[in-house]
């Protein structure tokens, strides 16, 4: 115990050399040695806010001091647990406030500078005020632990979104801020968004992270207006370190909540706090959304998730079957992957139905049963989406593109470097990616033998241009509408 106290005294001595008198008294005067357990030395702080600030500001420096003096295995653990000799007597309703301001008696004895004392007093009042305003006992009830990066299956359709999400978790607020992940229903947007929250919580224990659906965000806002607690609503969302909002498209046509989101966005963004959103379409395709809010979404990274190709669908089906303990021939699973082309959710639903047949009916799965299950899922999908039942024909896409842009087959499949022809190829690649399940390699073969990277560049370029160029956005929207109608 005595050795641990000496180590803590050493740390204080070294820290004091590098801080001004005022800073040292603000952060270290009220710390108290609590106990030592093995290599852990526990230090008591006056309150939770003080604990968080000490960890944030000085953990790295303390570690350097320990290593420098040969205490490589020693870990300093800060806690707001009071010392064992701590009196429960409270001078006011806020004991933390009493403890914090008691430091001024000592400070006054050691300095004659009234200005220095006043400066510190003002700063501490500000910290205490912030502590009282910030939400305490922060909980994140909507994060589901089952969503992780480890059980997310990666393929060419979602790799960029996956890598960006993982990077955000490791360094929130640094890169890709804000980030908007967009794509159709059941493709894994929620899985990635929840994984960001879970991984960030695992790596950064002190951060306040909140996942919420756009619908719940709206409902909370409406309720706060009804109960005259809008101030409480603002505090909840503007003191976060990371805000994750799912299905942002649900806020279309709702001007009041868009206004609130705009101000919440600004408050967090200007304080380098991480924002991540999901949407069923790119920002340029959002309707009844204020331009200034849409412009905020495009400040950072916009990344899409498209429908999975066969290889990824097969991997998803196999993993789901393994998780559910289903032992069926691989050709059965491949048939599911081949026929269910809509999204991840439908693939998993098909495997769940297979399990039900096995567990409840105790029958052997054959091709006939699989085809029956697939038929049920495909019919349900057609009834519950606005997508056309017939697959959009590649030739129809090309026909409409050539007609509207007034170019020829030779132009689109050739090697002309004319700007208008190059632009047409970019658009063709973008349309094929959005209306078909073709991979970038397959699209490249259709457009005159272009490489994967060339096709990917074309798709990303049009996506960026739609955000920045109104004329291009209008052209693409018009082409897409004509293709859908055709």
Curated annotation (Swiss-Prot):
Residues that coordinate or bind ATP: 186, 188-190
Family under the similarity heading: Belongs to the DnaA family.
Gene3D superfamilies assigned: 1.10.1750.10, 1.10.8.60, 3.30.300.180, P-loop containing nucleotide triphosphate hydrolases
PROSITE patterns, A to Z: DNAA
Annotated GO biological process: DNA replication initiation; regulation of DNA replication
Sample GO molecular function, one term: ATP binding
SUPFAM superfamilies named among the record's database cross-references: P-loop containing nucleoside triphosphate hydrolases (SSF52540), TrpR-like (SSF48295)
Protein name: Chromosomal replication initiator protein DnaA
Record bears the keyword Nucleotidyltransferase: no
Subunit-structure text: Oligomerizes as a right-handed, spiral filament on DNA at oriC.
Renumbered residue ranges of the record's region Domain I, interacts with DnaA modulators: 1-79
Region (Domain IV, binds dsDNA): 359-486
Predominant subcellular localization, coarse grouping: cytoplasm
UniProt-annotated location(s): Cytoplasm
InterPro entries listed in its UniProt record: AAA+_ATPase, Chromosome_initiator_DnaA, Chromosome_initiator_DnaA-like, Chromosome_initiator_DnaA_CS, DnaA_C, DnaA_dom, DnaA_N_dom, DnaA_N_sf
Function: Plays an essential role in the initiation and regulation of chromosomal replication. ATP-DnaA binds to the origin of replication (oriC) to initiate formation of the DNA replication initiation complex once per cell cycle. Binds the DnaA box (a 9 base pair repeat at the origin) and separates the double-stranded (ds)DNA. Forms a right-handed helical filament on oriC DNA; dsDNA binds to the exterior of the filament while single-stranded (ss)DNA is stabiized in the filament's interior. Binds to the bpuR promoter, possibly at 5'-TTTTTAAA-3'.
Organism of derivation: Borreliella burgdorferi (strain ATCC 35210 / DSM 4680 / CIP 102532 / B31)
Residue ranges of the region described as Domain II: 79-141
Lineage top rank: taxon: Bacteria
Record's comment describing the protein's domains: Domain I is involved in oligomerization and binding regulators, domain II is flexibile and of varying length in different bacteria, domain III forms the AAA+ region, while domain IV binds dsDNA.
Keyword flag Cytoplasm: yes
Keywords: ATP-binding, Cytoplasm, DNA replication, DNA-binding, Lipid-binding, Nucleotide-binding
Cellular component aspect of the GO annotation: cytoplasm; plasma membrane
Region (Domain III, AAA+ region): 142-358
């Amino acid at each position: 115990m005595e050795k641990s106290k000496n180590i803590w005294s050493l740390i204080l001595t070294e820290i004091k050399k590098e801080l001004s008198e005022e800073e040292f008294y603000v952060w270290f005067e009220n710390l108290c040695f609590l106990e030592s357990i093995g290599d852990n030395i526990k230090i008591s702080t006056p309150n939770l806010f003080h604990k968080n600030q000490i960890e944030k500001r000085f953990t790295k420096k303390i570690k350097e001091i320990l290593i420098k003096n040969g205490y490589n295995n020693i870990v300093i653990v800060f806690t707001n647990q009071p010392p064992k000799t701590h009196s429960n007597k409270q001078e006011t309703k806020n004991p933390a406030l009493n403890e914090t301001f008691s430091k001024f008696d000592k400070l006054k004895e050691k300095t004659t500078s009234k200005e220095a004392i006043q400066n510190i007093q003002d700063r501490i009042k500000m910290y205490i005020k912030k502590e009282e305003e910030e939400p305490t006992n922060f909980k994140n009830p909507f994060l589901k632990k089952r969503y992780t990066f480890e059980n997310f299956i990666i393929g060419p359709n979602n790799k960029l979104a996956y890598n960006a999400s993982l990077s955000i978790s490791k360094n929130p607020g640094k890169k890709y801020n804000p980030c908007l992940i967009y794509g159709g229903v059941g493709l894994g947007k929620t899985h990635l968004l929840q994984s960001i929250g879970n991984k960030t919580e695992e790596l950064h224990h002190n951060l306040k992270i909140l996942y919420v659906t756009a619908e719940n965000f709206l409902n909370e806002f409406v309720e706060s207006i009804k109960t005259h607690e809008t101030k409480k609503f603002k505090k909840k969302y503007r003191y976060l370190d990371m805000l994750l909002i799912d299905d942002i498209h649900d806020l279309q046509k709702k001007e009041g909540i868009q206004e609130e989101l705009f101000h919440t966005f600004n408050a967090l963004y200007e304080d380098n706090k991480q924002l991540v959103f999901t949407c069923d379409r790119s920002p340029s395709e959002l309707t009844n959304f204020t331009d200034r809010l849409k412009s905020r979404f495009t400040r950072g990274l916009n990344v899409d998730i498209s429908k999975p190709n066969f290889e990824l669908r097969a991997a998803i089906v196999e993993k789901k079957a393994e998780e559910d303990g289903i032992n069926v021939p691989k050709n059965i699973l491949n048939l599911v992957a081949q026929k269910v082309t809509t999204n991840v959710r439908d693939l998993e639903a098909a495997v769940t139905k297979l399990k039900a047949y096995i567990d409840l009916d105790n029958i052997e799965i054959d091709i006939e049963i699989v085809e029956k299950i697939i038929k049920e899922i495909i019919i349900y999908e057609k009834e519950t989406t606005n997508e056309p039942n017939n697959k959009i024909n590649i030739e129809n896409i090309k026909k409409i593109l050539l007609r509207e842009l007034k170019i020829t087959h030779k132009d689109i499949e050739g090697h002309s470097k004319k700007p208008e022809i190059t632009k047409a190829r970019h658009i063709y690649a973008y349309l094929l990616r959005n209306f078909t399940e073709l991979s970038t390699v397959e699209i490249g073969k259709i457009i005159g033998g272009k490489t994967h990277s060339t096709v990917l560049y074309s798709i990303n370029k049009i996506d960026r241009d739609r955000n920045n160029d109104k004329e291009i956005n209008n052209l693409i929207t018009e082409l897409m509408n004509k293709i859908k109608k055709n």
